[in-house]
Amino acid sequence: LSKAERVTGKNVTLPILSCILLSVTDSILTIKSTNLDLGLEIKIPVKMTESGSVAVSGTVLNTFISNLTHDKNVTLETIEGNLKVSTKHSYALIKAFPVDDFPTIPKITDQKPFTFNSQDLIKGLKSVMYSASPSTIRPVLSSVLMYPENDSVVFVATDSFRLGERKVNVKK
């Protein structure tokens, strides 16, 4: 929960971005959070009685759960559109948000993953970051494109005036 809560957005115009989506199906609890720039999905095996989904404030849920020191088992259930979190010694009723309002986190395509040294990542990013736009009005211009090419990873950034490209050899 603490990892998911760190990804939640602090956008007051879109309160759903401050939420964590909890979904249970087939004895798997899926925890999702996003700030629209970054999405996180964590799957945990659980004991369940029925499937369902609920979106609640990430900060409120994480604060409550992190303060449970003596209880190992936590029960989650929805009651009248809210989330009841209970243990042997305590419980909380947390206001829920409409699940349909939670943004869809894009699925990763079947592209082949590439692995390389973190120092190469830092070197590549530092080489092209000056070309990325500091404004978030057009996100594509404030981003860095990374893609594999033969034994290299190519880093590309532009703000529409400058273009930076760096090829970092990653073959070991």
Predicted regions and their residues:
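Structural preference for solvent-exposed beta-strand-turn elements
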Residues: 1-172
